[in-house]
Amino acid sequence: MTDIEIYKSWPFRTRFLRPECWALIKDYIVKHEITSVLEFGSGISTILFNNLGVDVVSYETDPVYLRRIKSYNLANVEFRLWDNITASINGVFGLSLVDGAMPRMNQLSYAIKHSRYIAIDDFSDKESSEGLYPMVKDRTRLDDESIKMAIFRRFKQ
């Protein structure tokens, strides 16, 4: 299935990653040869990552929604339920996507520790003022009336 076909066939009435944001993330994945993704907020992006052949660890807060997404039988995805507090994350991922309505600063702290690049959907300046900018560099931000997406590269440690 193409990306457009996936968007057209999306059956859930939930907020999802907009095609313009996906295009930016997909370009980063291809350009930087990213092979693994840590995702906070399962959904259409999970399917799109899977179709790229990227290995995904995807956290979701809603157990009912998680069961529905799991029904897609995505070969490259490991699903986990997020308790809004802690996560058992090992290793370093090429990219983290922070999406959805979870407590984002907690997710961002995990993303910064475990990823080379951090993509934040519906990015706000409030998040940057809460301590994100000092921990990342090479900020690329696409921001207009319809898109609020930011991608950062963390400092090498």
Where in the sequence are the language-model features?
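Conserved SAM-binding loop and adjacent beta-strand
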Residues: 10-21
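C-terminal substrate-binding/active-site "lid" region of AdoMet-derived donor-dependent transferases
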Residues: 94-95, 101-157
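SAM cofactor-binding core of SAM-dependent methyltransferases
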Residues: 19-84
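Short amphipathic alpha-helix with an adjacent loop that forms part of the alpha/beta core around
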Residues: 85-93
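A polyampholytic, Gly/Pro-enriched intrinsically disordered region
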Residues: 77-81, 97, 140
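Rossmann-like AdoMet
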Residues: 1-11
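Short catalytic-loop micro-motif centered on adjacent basic/acidic residues
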Residues: 36-39, 57-58, 95-99, 119-120
